[in-house]
């Protein structure tokens, strides 16, 4: 009598193994420990695939995203200034973009691919070295005050 009331019977809940069967059809089981290799999926289904060239593109993208996220964290976009609606909206937009980029890097690292992890950490490290550390800060010969922003 379920058909008469206009509702269909509830679909059975997928079994825990159905996820892994789906993953197996699409190139193997999902890794739950770190592994090394070019055949992986990062952020999107089928990307970067099995191509070594696309794997290197993936690593470069993760590196750039993590370095840019660090740039947004360290540059003067987030510094306080005179109170204004426009300034507050700009700070909010920059903060939101930085948070989104950081979460994308986190999700990429959750692929458990060792190369992706190394690319993310190298991007964050280089971003900090350029935008946050003392390595590239210029000092004035007269007052010995540091330049705070590298942007």
Swiss-Prot record:
Coiled-coil spans are none
Subcellular location(s) per record: Membrane
List the transmembrane segments. 52-72, 103-123
Keyword set includes Glycoprotein:
no
- Which Pfam family is one of this chain's hits? Ctr
User: What InterPro entries does the annotation carry?
Assistant: Cop_transporter
Tissue expression notes: Highly expressed in stems and at lower levels in leaves and flowers.
Q: What induces it?
A: No change in expression levels after treatment with high concentrations of copper.
What's its membrane topology? Multi-pass membrane protein
Under the cellular component aspect of Gene Ontology, which terms does the record hold?
membrane
Q: A Gene Ontology MF term for this entry?
A: copper ion transmembrane transporter activity
The UniProt similarity line reads: Belongs to the copper transporter (Ctr) (TC 1.A.56) family. SLC31A subfamily.
UniProt-listed PANTHER family: COPPER TRANSPORTER 3 (PTHR12483:SF81), SOLUTE CARRIER FAMILY 31 COPPER TRANSPORTERS (PTHR12483)
Q: What does this protein do?
A: Involved in the transport of copper.
Q: What protein name applies here?
A: Copper transporter 3
